[in-house]
């Protein structure tokens, strides 16, 4: 599932998302070969590596151009979104990226491919990646933070968030507000064991296995497949409908809730 984590500077959102490479599962051979071919074509396959068993974790700089992100140039080289195929594209300080770059992500997020055109020739590269974004709540980073003063005008905050247009955010299932880290309590160590890298990796492996058996990732379930794999009883349907009205969820938002619920159930082996 695509994710946007936003919160004040120093709250740990970027550090947490940079842990994702350790959670990535091994790929089936067909997907491994696809990832390997793309990196070989881009000249980024290490000489000592014959095949990449995991998807890549790509972290482009905020100054990256559309060509750098999507690909192109004289030889139509694959860009960051194709290098992140079957892996993760992480945009740290996402609001600092050009608006045009962020908007270009919409089509590959929907289709899983990117079409590059050069001198009357078109090249289609795979671009089925998980998008992770980290952002501050406003340009100065203090908006809504207890004990801090936000120096931004209402207009500047509005323009800041306009970079994340509705169509882009519609394709981001998870939007998480991250609070500043508080001092650990005595019980935190025991609780954190359930969320250690090793424990999470095992849960992810279970979820990935279930999704491969279905033949599709939960994030890409169609409306018909949601009905098939995310069936609800009457009580659950009433609860979801109440939440839809309470939070003014669109149909896409309701679908995202069901997909996420299916993933959580998969991780718990239900």
Spans of features found by a protein language model:
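Residues immediately C-terminal
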Residues: 89-90, 96-97, 183
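Short flexible coil/turn linkers enriched for glycine and charged/polar residues
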Residues: 1, 11-14, 63, 75, ...
């Amino acid at each position: 599932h695509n994710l946007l984590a936003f919160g004040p500077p120093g709250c740990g959102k970027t550090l947490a998302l940079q842990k994702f490479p350790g959670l990535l599962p091994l790929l089936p051979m067909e997907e491994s070969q696809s990832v390997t071919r793309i990196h070989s074509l881009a000249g980024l396959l290490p000489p000592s590596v014959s095949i990449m068993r995991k998807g890549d974790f790509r972290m482009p700089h905020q100054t990256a151009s559309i060509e750098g992100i999507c690909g192109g140039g004289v030889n139509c080289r694959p860009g960051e979104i194709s290098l992140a195929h079957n892996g993760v594209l992480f945009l740290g300080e996402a609001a600092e990226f050009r608006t045009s770059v962020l908007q270009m992500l919409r089509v590959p997020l929907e289709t899983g491919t990117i079409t590059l055109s050069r001198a009357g020739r078109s090249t289609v590269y795979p671009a089925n990646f998980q998008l992770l974004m980290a952002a501050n709540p406003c340009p100065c980073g203090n908006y809504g933070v207890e004990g801090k003063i936000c120096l931004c005008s209402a207009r500047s905050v509005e323009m800041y968030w306009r970079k994340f247009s509705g169509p882009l955010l519609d394709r981001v299932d998870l939007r998480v507000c991250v609070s500043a880290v508080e001092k650990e309590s005595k019980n935190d160590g025991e609780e954190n064991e359930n969320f250690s890298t090793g424990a999470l990796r095992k849960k992810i492996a279970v979820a990935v296995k279930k999704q491969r058996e279905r033949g599709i990732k939960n994030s890409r379930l169609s409306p018909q497949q949601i009905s098939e794999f995310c069936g609800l009883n009457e009580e659950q349907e009433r609860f979801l409908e109440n939440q839809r009205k309470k939070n003014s969820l669109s149909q896409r938002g309701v679908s995202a809730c069901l997909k996420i619920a299916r993933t959580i159930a998969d991780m718990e082996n239900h």
